[in-house]
Amino acid sequence: MFLKHLTIQNFRNHEELSLDFDSRLIFFVGDNGEGKTNLLEAICILSWLKSFRESEDSNLIRWGSENYFLRGKIKNNLKESVLEIGFTSKPSVKRKLKFNQEEIKKRTDLIGKFITVLLTPMDLKIIEGGPAERRKFIDAFISSFDPFYLEFLLEYNKILKHRNALLKSGNLDISHLSIWDKKIVEKGIFILNKRREVVLELNSFYRVNLDKLSGGKDGLELIYKPNVKDQDEFLEKLNRNLSRDLRLGYTSVGIHRDDLFIGTDQRDITEFGSQGQKRSTVIALKAATFNYYKDILNTIPVLLIDDVIRELDVKRREYFVDLVVTAGQAFFTTTDLEGIQDYVGKLKDQKQIFLIRQGKVEPIK
């Protein structure tokens, strides 16, 4: 996949931008606070339909404006398409999505249209943030290519909310609750099986990547640890824990309690990992998602790399350059104009550089 053009209006600190991309490596260069990461964020929203930094769309609107607008022209193989996202802070209309000028009502209809892999310093949260962050990571990854998974996940969360409301109310009708139990198990088992299948594949890529990054020193694994193993156990645990759940006011068992173990010999990386090991794990994990798209789904995503490479030592930087060579297109943010040559590798003639200064974005020849 290639992003050929990006239009931005009233997004973050950028009033209006129209950028054409005709190279494989795109660098956004500027001092901290100039808005480099805002450009990657705009590209991410075209891909994920949400920001990786901000949960509220209204906070993405440029100060003094009422809306923002993003347009991307995407090339996949020989086919070009246009993806547009508009958001207004007015009460009447919130977000509007268009694909090739046709309005899109369901976000699942845009899954797979523009796939990106983002690497940012914030990714350390996957390692350090515990089970919730790791579930969020695996759910976001699978949802990026499987619309059924996303629909089941959204349904599961709705059912969970209803069940929790029933538990909190104290007015418990067992026959009513059993209806929700059957629904939550049905949705949950689909999610469980998909997570299990995908994590198994990801682990094979992750281990190879980590061996390259650590020279074989870090024998870590990804292991999916479900809270329930199958449909029968899920139902049995819901029934067995009913008294406890009534006391707590929420559902204490289910796939919303799963974990993605990252470590070795039953010890999670958070217990022993150095910052270097954690950084290697994040890179190996994100690279594994790239491998999955490429080798399992036959899609080469766009790489988005936010000010990460300057923190890497020589060995990790060399690995990253090799990864970039296999990608179709990669976008980087950096403060170091002089250091760009260190990580373009064999692609030094296939780069574009944009200088970001005081809200303006200018190409450097």
From Swiss-Prot:
**What keywords does the record list, in alphabetical order?**
ATP-binding, Cytoplasm, DNA damage, DNA repair, DNA replication, DNA-binding, Nucleotide-binding, SOS response
- Keyword DNA repair in the entry? The reply is yes
The UniProt entry, under InterPro entries, shows:
DNA-binding_RecF, DNA-binding_RecF_CS, P-loop_NTPase, RecF/RecN/SMC_N, RecF_2
Cell compartment(s), UniProt: Cytoplasm
| Gene3D superfamilies linked to this entry | P-loop containing nucleotide triphosphate hydrolases, RecF/RecN/SMC, N-terminal domain
GO terms classed as biological process:
DNA replication; DNA synthesis involved in DNA repair; double-strand break repair; SOS response
What are the transmembrane regions?
A: none
| Cellular compartments per GO CC | cytoplasm
Give the superkingdom in one word: Bacteria
Residues bound to ATP are G30, D31, N32, G33, E34, G35, K36, T37
Q: Does the keyword Nucleotide-binding apply?
A: yes
SUPFAM superfamilies to which the protein is assigned, alphabetical: P-loop containing nucleoside triphosphate hydrolases
Reported function: The RecF protein is involved in DNA metabolism; it is required for DNA replication and normal SOS inducibility. RecF binds preferentially to single-stranded, linear DNA. It also seems to bind ATP.
The family classification in the record reads: Belongs to the RecF family.
Q: Which NCBIfam families match?
A: recf
Q: What is this protein called?
A: DNA replication and repair protein RecF
Q: Which organism is it from?
A: Leptospira interrogans serogroup Icterohaemorrhagiae serovar copenhageni (strain Fiocruz L1-130)
